[in-house]
């Protein structure tokens, strides 16, 4: 599952540019400002929906987004210090994927008033379709 989540994250970052628009399950919460260019950082402009807030508040804002997404049926399924990958079961089977990435401009001082960003993007495909790394498909026995 970890390999699937990492691959899904790479697809989000390397995917084709799409129009910048809010995602259906990702509202602009209090304290967040829509940032269409994603700060021109991390190659996310046009590939992700981004919001910004002062860096001192970005952790609390990320927590608020996790709670909001959980309330909409998204389950945290993995990630690391600055990234959360969510999955949501589809009615007909399979899972949709969504990623939230926190970042800031590391070429500038990281003071509390610096701008921090949260980037959101869907992960294409069915995240529940892939098995664990190294897992072989079951072969029917005669």
Where are these regions (language model features)?
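N-terminal signal peptide c-region/cleavage motif recognized by signal peptidases
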Residues: 9, 14-16
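An acidic-aromatic pocket/loop used at catalytic or ligand-binding sites
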Residues: 19-142
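Homeobox/homeodomain signature
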Residues: 3, 16-18
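Sec-dependent signal peptide recognition
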Residues: 1-8
């Amino acid at each position: 599952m970890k390999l699937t989540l990492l691959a899904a994250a790479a697809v989000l970052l390397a995917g084709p540019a799409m129009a910048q628009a809010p995602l259906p399950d990702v509202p602009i919460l209090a304290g967040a400002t829509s940032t269409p260019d994603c700060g021109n950082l991390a190659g996310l402009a046009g590939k992700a929906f981004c919001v910004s807030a002062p860096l001192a508040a970005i952790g609390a804002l990320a927590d608020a987004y996790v709670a909001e997404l959980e309330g909409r049926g998204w389950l945290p399924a993995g990630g690391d210090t600055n990234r959360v990958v969510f999955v949501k079961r589809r009615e007909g089977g399979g899972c949709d994927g969504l990623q939230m990435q926190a970042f800031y401009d590391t070429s500038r001082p990281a003071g509390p008033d610096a701008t921090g960003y949260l980037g959101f993007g869907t992960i294409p495909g069915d995240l529940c379709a892939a098995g664990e790394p190294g897992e072989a498909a079951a072969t029917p026995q005669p």
